[in-house]
Regions:
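Non-transmembrane, aqueous-exposed alpha-helical and coiled segments at domain scale
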Residues: 1-440
Length: 440
C-alpha cells in the first residue's frame, strides 16, 4: 500500500484531532491517493464543483447531518470557491418549470412531484442551507463555469465534475482538474496529485486529422463523440477545424467525455497550452494518428440515431445547459411559431431570470415550449410515460437517456440531429433530419 505524504496539519486531521468531518474526509483523500497510485496531495488554488447533497453525503462520506451542522457552527467552510452541479429531480430541481412536466409517476410511485410539501421535503434544503453557509454558490448546472462569473486561470488546480466541464477546465481554460469534485476536495482544498494535475500527462499523444472542415455545432458534437470512442483516455491534438465558439467547445467536450473519457485535448491556435502543434505534443511525435473521414462522421451520426419511426413524441434541447447566447438564438428561431408536441428547453437557474428579463421566456411560452432549469432529463428519472421517440441535438443526451433509463419494454428511441431538425420536429411531430444537414 502506498504511504501518502502528509504535512503536520493533514496528520492531525487524519488522527481526528480536529473533529469527525475533517478525519473522514482526510481518510477518503488518502484512500483516493492510494487508488490513483500517488503518494502526493496537491493544494487546490482554483475552484470546486460537486453534485447534490444526497449523492455526496451518502456515497462519499460517513458522517451525519448533525456532525456537518456542528462543523458549520464551528466556522467550517469550503477552502476554494465551490459551485453546485445539476440536481436530480427528486431533490432540489428544476427550480423553475417543473410543474406539469408529466413526471409525477416516475421513481416515487403514487407520490406526485407537484405536491408542494413533497417537493420541499425532497429538496434536502437543510443540506443546501449548510453548504451556503460554508460558501457554496448554488448554480445547479452542468455548465456552472459559464455563469459563475469566476473561473480558474491557467495552471490553477481545481476539483470539478461533469463530462463537458472537465475538458473545459483543462483544455479551454488551461486550469487543472480530474473528475473528482466532491465535498471532501472542496472542504479540504486538496486533491490527489495525478493525471491532469501533472504537466507531463497533459501533452497530446494522438494526432486527429479531419478530412472535412469542422465548423457547425453538430459537426463539433459528432466529432467529440467519435474522438472519445477512438481515443478513450488519451490526449488528442485536433487539426482541420474552424475556431470553435463557446457552445461548440461545450458540445464537443460533452461528446468526448461521453464517447470516451477524455479530460484534456489541444486545438493548436485555439486552446491555451497549444500555440502550435509541436507545443501540443511537448516536442514529441504522435503515438498514432486518427483520421476523421466522412464515413467516420456518418457512422457516428447513425449510431446516435436509433429509431424505427419518424413520429416524434417529444423534443429536448439543452444538453449541456444552454448559455445566454444559446437562449437568445433559440428564442429568435421560435418567435411566432407554435409547437405541436412537447418541447423542453433546459438551462441553469441563474439564467432563467435573464431569459425572463430579456423576453425569451415569453417567446418560449407563447410557442408552447417549456423552459426548465437546474437539472436534466438523465437526472430526472427518464422521460414522461407517453414518450417513446425523443428528438435531441446532443450526442451526450442521446447516449445517456437510453443508457441510464431504458423503459421496461426497451421502446425508447432517439432521433438525433441539428437544432433546426429538432425545432422542425417540434412543429410537425415528424423527424426529417438527415446526415446532409450536419454542416448547417
Amino acid at each position: 500500500m502506498i504511504d501518502v505524504k502528509l504535512n503536520d496539519h493533514e496528520k492531525r486531521m487524519l488522527q481526528g484531532e480536529e473533529g469527525l468531518v475533517p478525519r473522514v474526509t482526510m481518510e477518503w483523500l488518502v484512500e483516493m491517493c492510494q487508488i490513483a497510485g500517488t503518494d502526493t496531495i496537491v493544494d487546490l488554488d482554483g475552484t470546486g464543483d460537486f453534485h447534490t447533497p444526497w449523492t455526496t453525503m451518502t456515497f462519499h462520506h460517513d458522517f451525519s447531518f448533525e456532525e456537518l451542522q456542528k462543523l458549520v457552527e464551528a466556522g467550517g467552510t469550503f477552502k476554494i470557491p465551490t459551485f453546485s452541479n445539476k440536481s436530480p429531480f427528486t431533490e432540489m430541481s428544476p427550480i423553475h418549470g417543473w410543474e406539469g412536466c408529466d413526471m409525477c409517476s416516475r421513481a416515487h410511485g403514487n407520490q406526485r412531484y407537484d405536491d408542494c410539501y413533497f417537493h420541499k421535503q425532497s429538496m434536502h434544503e437543510e443540506y443546501y442551507e449548510l453548504f451556503r453557509k460554508m460558501g457554496m454558490l448554488q448554480t445547479h448546472s452542468c455548465t456552472s463555469y459559464l455563469t459563475a462569473s469566476y473561473v480558474p486561470t491557467i495552471g490553477q488546480h481545481c476539483s470539478w465534475n461533469e463530462s463537458s466541464a472537465i475538458p473545459y477546465c483543462n483544455a479551454v481554460l488551461g486550469a487543472r482538474s480530474n473528475i473528482d469534485g466532491s465535498f471532501a476536495t472542496c472542504f479540504l482544498g486538496k486533491a490527489p496529485y495525478y493525471d491532469m494535475h501533472v504537466t507531463e500527462n497533459r501533452y497530446a499523444t494522438v494526432l486527429v486529422e479531419n478530412d472535412r472542415l469542422i465548423k457547425s455545432d453538430l459537426e463539433w458534437d459528432i466529432l467529440g463523440f467519435a474522438i472519445g470512442e477512438d481515443c478513450g483516455l488519451a490526449v488528442p491534438a485536433i487539426t482541420g477545424t474552424a475556431k470553435p465558439n463557446t457552445t461548440q467547445f461545450c458540445k464537443m467536450n460533452a461528446g468526448m467525455n461521453t464517447g470516451g473519457s477524455i479530460r484534456m485535448y489541444h486545438i493548436p491556435g485555439s486552446t491555451p497550452e497549444a500555440p502550435t502543434l509541436e507545443a501540443a505534443f511537448g516536442g514529441k511525435k504522435p503515438v498514432r494518428t486518427m483520421r476523421v473521414t466522412e464515413s467516420v462522421l456518418r457512422a457516428t451520426y447513425d449510431k446516435l440515431n436509433f429509431h424505427t419511426s419518424d413520429d416524434v413524441d417529444m423534443v429536448y434541447l439543452g444538453c449541456p445547459h444552454l448559455n445566454a447566447v444559446d437562449l437568445m438564438l433559440l428564442a429568435r428561431k421560435l418567435e411566432g411559431k407554435k409547437v405541436k408536441i412537447p418541447l423542453w428547453i433546459m438551462t441553469m437557474p441563474w439564467l432563467y431570470n435573464v431569459a425572463k428579463e430579456q423576453g425569451y421566456l415569453k417567446i418560449f411560452e407563447d410557442a408552447g415550449a417549456k423552459l426548465m432549469d437546474g437539472t436534466c432529463m438523465a437526472a430526472m428519472g427518464g422521460v414522461p410515460d407517453y414518450v417513446h421517440n425523443i428528438a435531441v441535438d446532443s450526442a451526450k443526451q442521446s447516449y445517456y437517456i437510453t443508457g441510464c433509463y431504458p423503459d421496461d419494454d426497451n421502446r425508447l428511441q432517439v432521433c438525433y440531429g441539428t437544432q433546426d431538425d429538432c425545432i422542425d420536429a417540434a412543429m410537425t411531430g415528424k423527424w426529417r433530419g438527415d446526415f446532409k444537414n450536419i454542416g448547417r
